[in-house]
C-alpha cells in the first residue's frame, strides 16, 4: 500500500544526522518526511551528554552558520559551558557544553514538529525501493510505502546492531531500542562495501550514592560562551558543576584479572572501536605505565539523578563494572543504574560516496552519520546537513554543493572520508585541518552564511543580523586605520603607558592593535580610539583579523601552493622519526609505505593534509625543495 502523498526527500532515522538532514530540505521549501522508529527519542544523546569540544565545536558553529539546529539546541540545554584552549590561539579555541539530555531532546523535537514542509512518521523502515539504480521510495514494517525522489539514510548504530555486556550479547540499536535488521539485510544486497565497527558507553551511576563532598569540582566558565550566532546567554538554563575522580591500581587490577570475560579481548567483538575514545580496558592495557586515569562525573540533567562517568566506557560483565566503579574514590558505595556496553554495527565504506554524500551506485540515495564510519554527534549532524542540502538540490536538478577543505571543517571531514575512507570510527580534530587559522569558530558565519542564504537555508532575520555584523567589522577596521598617532602627538604619553616600548614612529589604530601587549579593550579605552563597539562578535573578529593578518594571508597563499607539490620527491632515506608534529599513527604509516613523493604520501589512508604540510616544512628546512616549491 502506498501512502497518499509523495515526498521530495525522505530521511530514515531521527538522531543528530537525521535531524539536520530533515530540516535542511524542508527549509529549502521541499516536502520532506522524517521516518523514525520512535518520535519520543528524536535528538536522543545516546552516549555522552555533551556538545562541542576540540574540532567538534567548530562543526557546531558551521552547522549553525548554515541554519542548522544543533547550536540552538545546545544553548537551550547546556548546563555547563566552557571554552577549551582559551589561553591558546584562536584557531584551536573550542566551545563545549554539558547538556541536559531531556532539555536537548525537547529542543530538537519542538524544532522538528514546528518546521514547515516537514512531516514526521513513526515506523521502522525495512526497505529502500530502487528502480534502475535510482531511488523511488521507502517501505516500512507495517507494509506502508512512501514514494520519493531522494532518500537520506541516517541509521546510526542501528543497522545490524549487536549489544555486548561481558560474553552475553543481543541485537539492539542502543540500550532499550531494537536494531534495524531487515533494512541492514536489504542494504547488504546493494553494490556497496560494508563492514563492522564498534563503539561503547560507560555505566550510568546513581548520584544519590556518590560522595561528592570529597571530590574535586569542575565549574564552567564565569563568562558563559554561546554556541549559536543567533543565541544569547539568556537562553542557557541553570549552570551546575561536574566532578572529578580517578581510577587507581585497584581498578586496573580488577580489569586485568577479568580480561578473559571481555568480549573485546576474547575475540567476540570483531568491529574496530574509536581510537580517541578507548574503553577503560584498552586504556589500562595500552597505557600500562599509567597508575591512574582521570574520570569526569557529568550530570545527565538538572532533574536527573543519573551521572555519566566520562572515561570508563566498558563492555565487561556487570559484576566487574560494579567492582571498577566501587574501587574509585567517592564511588565506594555507588550503584549502577544502567550497565555500560559495547555495540557493533554496520557501516559503509565512505569511498563509495560522492563528496555530496550521495552513493555512487544509486542515484538519489544519500548516507550520513555513523553509517559512514564516523563517531560523534557533531560529525553526524554536519553530514546530515550536507546530505540534506544535496538531496534538496538533487530533486530540484540543481548543481550540488559541498565545502572545500579550506572552507570548512565539514569539508575536511567529507574529503577525508570520501578520499581516504576509514577503518576505525573517525572523529574531527583541529589537527586534521591544514588551514585551521582560516577555519575558526568565530568566523564560521563569514565563511558559510552567504552560501546558506543563497541555498535558501536561513531566514531574513539571520541574514540581516549577519550583514550588520559584517558591516560593523568593516566599519571598525576602517575607523582604526584612519586614526593615527604621531611621536609628537599630545596623546603620546597616555599611549606609551600601555605599550611595552615607546612609540618612535607614526602608527594607526590597527598598527597598535597588532602589538602583543594591546588588545581591543585596552586600545578603545584610550580617548583617541574611543568609542568601542558593542557588538562582541564583531570585536573578536576585528582583533583576530588584525593581529593574525600576516598568518592568514600566508595560509591563503599556502592553499595555492599546496597544489604544486604533487611531484615533490621524498628521499629514500628520509627519517620520519625526526619530524616533530607527526602523530604516531601517521609516522607509522609513512615508515611502512615509504612514499616517493608528497603526492603519493597524501594518498596513504590516514596521512592527513596537516601531516603533508609538516613534511613540506621539514623538506624545506633540509634544503630538499626546489626553488618556488
UniProtKB/Swiss-Prot annotation:
InterPro entries: FAD/NAD-bd_sf, GIDA_C_N, MnmG, MnmG-rel, MnmG-rel_CS, MnmG_C, MnmG_C_subdom, MnmG_C_subdom_sf. GO terms for biological process: tRNA methylation; tRNA wobble uridine modification. It holds the Pfam family SAM_GIDA_C. Belongs to the MnmG family. GO terms for cellular component: cytosol. The keyword Cell cycle does not apply. One of its GO terms (molecular function) is flavin adenine dinucleotide binding. This is tRNA uridine 5-carboxymethylaminomethyl modification enzyme MnmG. Its main location: cytoplasm. NAD-binding protein involved in the addition of a carboxymethylaminomethyl (cmnm) group at the wobble position (U34) of certain tRNAs, forming tRNA-cmnm(5)s(2)U34. FAD binds at residues 13-18. Keywords: Cytoplasm, FAD, Flavoprotein, NAD, tRNA processing. PANTHER family: GLUCOSE INHIBITED DIVISION PROTEIN A, PROTEIN MTO1 HOMOLOG, MITOCHONDRIAL. NAD(+) binds at residues 273-287. Its cofactor is FAD. It comes from Mannheimia succiniciproducens (strain KCTC 0769BP / MBEL55E). Homodimer. Heterotetramer of two MnmE and two MnmG subunits. Coiled coil: none annotated. The keyword Nucleotide-binding does not apply. It is found in: Cytoplasm.
Amino acid at each position: 500500500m502506498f501512502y497518499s502523498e509523495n515526498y521530495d526527500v525522505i530521511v530514515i532515522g531521527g538522531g543528530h544526522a537525521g535531524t539536520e538532514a530533515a530540516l535542511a530540505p524542508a527549509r529549502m521549501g521541499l516536502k520532506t518526511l522524517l521516518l523514525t522508529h520512535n518520535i519520543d527519542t528524536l535528538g536522543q544523546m545516546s552516549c555522552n551528554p555533551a556538545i562541542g569540544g576540540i574540532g567538534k565545536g567548530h562543526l557546531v558553529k558551521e552547522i549553525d552558520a548554515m541554519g542548522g539546529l544543533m547550536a540552538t539546541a545546545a544553548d537551550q540545554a547546556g548546563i555547563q559551558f566552557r571554552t577549551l584552549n582559551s589561553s591558546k590561539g584562536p584557531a584551536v579555541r573550542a566551545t563545549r557544553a554539558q547538556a541536559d539530555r531531556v532539555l536537548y531532546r525537547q529542543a530538537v523535537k519542538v524544532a522538528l514538529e514546528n518546521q514547515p514542509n516537514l512531516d514526521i512518521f513513526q515506523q521502522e523502515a525495512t526497505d529502500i525501493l530502487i528502480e534502475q539504480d535510482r531511488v523511488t521510495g521507502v517501505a516500512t514494517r507495517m507494509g506502508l510505502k512512501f514514494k520519493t525522489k531522494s532518500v537520506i539514510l541516517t541509521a546510526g548504530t542501528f543497522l545490524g546492531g549487536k549489544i555486548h555486556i561481558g560474553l552475553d550479547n543481543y541485537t539492539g540499536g542502543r540500550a532499550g531500542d531494537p536494531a534495524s535488521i531487515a533494512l541492514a539485510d536489504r542494504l547488504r544486497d546493494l553494490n556497496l562495501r560494508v563492514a563492522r565497527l564498534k563503539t561503547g558507553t560507560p555505566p550510568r551511576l546513581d548520584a544519590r550514592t556518590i560522595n561528592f563532598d570529597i571530590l574535586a569540582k569542575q565549574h564552567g566558565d564565569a563568562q558563559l560562551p554561546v554556541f549559536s550566532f543567533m543565541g544569547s546567554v539568556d537562553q542557557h538554563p541553570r549552570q551546575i558543576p561536574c566532578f572529578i575522580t580517578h581510577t587507581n591500581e585497584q581498578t586496573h587490577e580488577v580489569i586485568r584479572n577479568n580480561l578473559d570475560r571481555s568480549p573485546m579481548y576474547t575475540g567476540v567483538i570483531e568491529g574496530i572501536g574509536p581510537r580517541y575514545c578507548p574503553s577503560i580496558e584498552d586504556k589500562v592495557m595500552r597505557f600500562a605505565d599509567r597508575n591512574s586515569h582521570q574520570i569526569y562525573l557529568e550530570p545527565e540533567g538538572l532533574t536527573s539523578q543519573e551521572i555519566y562517568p566520562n572515561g570508563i566506557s566498558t563492555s565487561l560483565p556487570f559484576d566487574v563494572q560494579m567492582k571498577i566503579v566501587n574501587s574509585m574514590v567517592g564511588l565506594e558505595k555507588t550503584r549502577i543504574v544502567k550497565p555500560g556496553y559495547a555495540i557493533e554495527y554496520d557501516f559503509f565504506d565512505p569511498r563509495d560516496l560522492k563528496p555530496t554524500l550521495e552513493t555512487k551506485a544509486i542515484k538519489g540515495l544519500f548516507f550520513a552519520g555513523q553509517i559512514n564510519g564516523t563517531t560523534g554527534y557533531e560529525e553526524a549532524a554536519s553530514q546530515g546537513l550536507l546530505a540534506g542540502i544535496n538531496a534538496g538540490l538533487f530533486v530540484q536538478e540543481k548543481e550540488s554543493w559541498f565545502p572545500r577543505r579550506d572552507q570548512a571543517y565539514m569539508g575536511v571531514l567529507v574529503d577525508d572520508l570520501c578520499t581516504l575512507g576509514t577503518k576505525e570510527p573517525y572523529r574531527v580534530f583541529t589537527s586534521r585541518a591544514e588551514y585551521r587559522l582560516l577555519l575558526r569558530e568565530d568566523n564560521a558565519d563569514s565563511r558559510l552564511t552567504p552560501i546558506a542564504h543563497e541555498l535558501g537555508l536561513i531566514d531574513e532575520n539571520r541574514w540581516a543580523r549577519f550583514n550588520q555584523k559584517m558591516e560593523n567589522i568593516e566599519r571598525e577596521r576602517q575607523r582604526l586605520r584612519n586614526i593615527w598617532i604621531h611621536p609628537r602627538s599630545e596623546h603620546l604619553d597616555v599611549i606609551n603607558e600601555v605599550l611595552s616600548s615607546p612609540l618612535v614612529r607614526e602608527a594607526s589604530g590597527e598598527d597598535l592593535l597588532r602589538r602583543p601587549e594591546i588588545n581591543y579593550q585596552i586600545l578603545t579605552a584610550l580617548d583617541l580610539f574611543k568609542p568601542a563597539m558593542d557588538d562582541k562578535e564583531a570585536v573578536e573578529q576585528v582583533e583576530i583579523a588584525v593581529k593574525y593578518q600576516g598568518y592568514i594571508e600566508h595560509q591563503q597563499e599556502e592553499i595555492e601552493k599546496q597544489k604544486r607539490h604533487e611531484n615533490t620527491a621524498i628521499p629514500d632515506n628520509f627519517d620520519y622519526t625526526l619530524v616533530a608534529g607527526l602523530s604516531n599513527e601517521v609516522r607509522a604509516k609513512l615508515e611502512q609505505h615509504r612514499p616517493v613523493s608528497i603526492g603519493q604520501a597524501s594518498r596513504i589512508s590516514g596521512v592527513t593534509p596537516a601531516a603533508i604540510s609538516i613534511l613540506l616544512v621539514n623538506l624545506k628546512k633540509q634544503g630538499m625543495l626546489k626553488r618556488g616549491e
